[in-house]
Amino acid sequence: MWCDTIPFMHDSHVHLTREPLISNLSEIIHSFQDKGGTYILSQSTQSDDFDTNLQLTTLYPAVIQAAIGLHPTIFEDISTKNTYEQKDIFIKGEREIKLFEKYVQKHNNKIKAIGECGLDYYQFSLNESYSKETKEELKEIQKISFRKHLQLALKFNLPLSIHVRDVADSDECVRDVIRLICEEGKGALCGVFHSYTGNMSYLEEILDLGFYIGFNGIITYKSGENVRDILKQTPFDRILFETDGPFLPPQSVRKNGHIKEKFAQPADIKEIIETASQVKNITYEYLEKSSDANYSLLFL
C-alpha cells in the first residue's frame, strides 16, 4: 500500500532550462533535496531546449527526468516580429513539429513524458493586431502539433504533460483538447493537465479520461479561489504537485520584500503541499504520500 511507503516529494512540472534556474541548478537541486525532494520532471517547450533538458538527466540521473514537447505558444514566436503570412505559420510550424518528432523517435528511451504540449487560445488573444484569420491559423497549427504529441505518446507509451488555457469566459480550448484526446486515443492515453485553471464543469470528463491534475503556487494566491475549488473536487488519487518554475512563485515568495528576484523552484513544493493539505482538510503527510504514489504510477 502507498500509505506504507516513504514519501519522495516530487515536482511534476518545472522548466529547469530557463533562467534563473539553469544558472543556479546545483543550488536549486540541493535546496529541493534538503526539503525531502526526490524527483523532478523538467519540461521542454521548443526544439532549442531539447538537448539541454535531456543533458540534465545525465547530470542528476537520480533526480531529474525529462519531458520533451512543444509549448503551443511557440507558434507565435517562430515568425519574426509577430508578422504573419499563412505560409510562414504552417511552413515554420510544421518544421518545428518534424524536429520534435525526430527527436522523440531517436531519444524515446531516455524520455519520461511528452510535454509541455497542448492548446493555448489565450496568449494570442492579447495581440490586437492579429486578424481573425491569423488567430484561426494559430489555432490550426496548435492542433496539428498537439495531434502529433498525442500520436507519439501512444506510439512510445509515454504520459503527457498538457497545457490548456482559454480566453476568459470561453471553454473552446479545453473542449478542443478533450476532443483531440478522444479522437487520437481515448482510454489509451494518460498524463496530467498541468496547472488547470479552466471551467470546473470539465473536471469530471478529464478525470474520466484517466488524467491527473497538476496544482502549483496558484493555490497560494488570493486570486486562486477557482483553482482551490478544483482541488477540493479532485480525488486524492488524481492529484500531482508542480511549481511550473521559474513561473508562478508561491505567495510567500511574491510578498517577500527581501527577495529581489522572485521565481518558483522545486523546493517550493513543500509550501504548495502545505496549502493544499489545508484546502483538502487532510494531513500534509497523507497528501504528500498519496501524490507521490500518483507520480510513481504515471512517470516511474
What do these predicted regions represent?
Residues 1-300:
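Mid-domain alpha/beta scaffold segments of enzyme catalytic cores
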